[in-house]
Amino acid sequence: CWAPYDEATYQAALNFVQPADVVLDIGAGDLRLACRIANIAQQVIAIERQPGLLAGHAPLPPHLTVLCADARAIPWPKGITLAVLLMRHCTHFNAYVTRLRRIGCRRLITNARWGMGAELVNLGCRADWDTVKLGWYACVCGQTGFLPGPPAALTAALMEHIHEVETCPACRGSQQGV
């Protein structure tokens, strides 16, 4: 099931795109965002598995390549600098991140972790879970939440900060087959 996002979400995503980027748009829908990204980025590769969403599209920008396929089932090119995953109900976030890291991509625009807006996720090195003592966290596997701690230690700045982590309890559970 596909549905377009509001203009504020698209604009937030576009603000993260740089002219030198080679972008992989995973689940590109009707290409409305991919076409706009192609006006900014060096190259865009858009993958959408529903052919009906791609049919009858106006002429495409020259820097846009469209693939009708399941992004989980096809190889991705190396050289991707930025990926887009606007899929707020995505259940394969960790699999996508793992593949993006494998091809060298280090930045991801997504709404899959928090289910709203658009954030830029750094796919590079992240803090280990054991270093987080209190506050909001977002893991590379897609899990998010709040780690409670002593109320006296909670500050306004800490409430605004999101700890970007690896190996949260959900990751550890899946690694142990739980």
Give the residues covered by each predicted segment.
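Conserved class I S-adenosyl-L-methionine
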Residues: 20-29
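S-adenosyl-L-methionine
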Residues: 1-18
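A short, conserved alpha-helix within the catalytic core of class I
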Residues: 90-104
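Conserved SAM/SAH-binding beta-strand->alpha-helix loop
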Residues: 50-52
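Conserved SAM-binding strand-loop segment of SAM-dependent methyltransferases
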Residues: 62-71
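Conserved SAM-binding motif I beta-strand of class I
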Residues: 43-48
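Conserved SAM-binding loop of SAM-dependent methyltransferases across substrates and taxa
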Residues: 30-40
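Conserved SAM-binding loop
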Residues: 57-58
